[in-house]
A protein has these predicted regions:
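N-terminal nicking endonuclease/strand-transfer module with a His-rich metal-binding environment
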Residues: 1-160
């Protein structure tokens, strides 16, 4: 929560199922719901949805909320507490979704196969909303990569 809400240019766009007056209120609400299933080791999920700079003009706060909620539905992250926070610390538009993996009925929201589902859902939403598709590895900001991705891109550059 500190990373998502603590940044200077962070804006809480939407909250559902939590008191959103302060960061502490949000944390208390998440903890109360997480106590319905204390065996779950990682009760909070975090997803960052990043978009191309090319899409910035059409990504209003309302559109970012709509895309985040649609993403959550497609990923089966429903019936639970969540917040959507927009960061404006980078040139590309992006939001962070923080959600309780214990739903409102005490059931665990699975994170199984998330990487595969995430890829499919992102492609679907980009196509549906006419968002920019990067043309492969050429658009990657290599100076910002960390290992092991940095080495992968160095190899890619050397081989091509």
């Amino acid at each position: 929560m500190d990373y998502v809400l603590g940044k200077q240019q962070a804006v809480l766009l939407h909250a559902d199922g939590v008191l959103a007056e302060s960061r502490q209120d949000i944390i208390r609400c998440f903890c109360a719901q997480a106590s319905m299933n204390p065996r779950l080791g990682k009760p909070v999920g975090h997803i960052a949805l990043s978009y191309s700079v090319n899409d910035a003009p059409k990504l209003t706060d309302e559109k970012m909320i709509q895309l985040a909620q649609e993403y959550m539905r497609e990923m089966k992250i429903t019936d639970t507490q969540y917040i959507i926070v927009r960061h404006q610390d980078r040139e590309h538009p992006h939001v962070h979704i923080v959600f309780n993996r214990i739903d409102n009925n005490g059931k665990t929201i699975s994170d199984r196969n998330d990487m595969y589902r995430n890829e499919q859902v992102c492609k679907k939403l980009k196509a549906k909303h006419g968002l920019y598709f990067a043309k492969g590895k050429e658009q990657v900001k290599r100076h910002r990569l960390k290992e092991p991705d940095k080495s992968k891109y160095e190899i890619y550059t050397a081989v091509r």
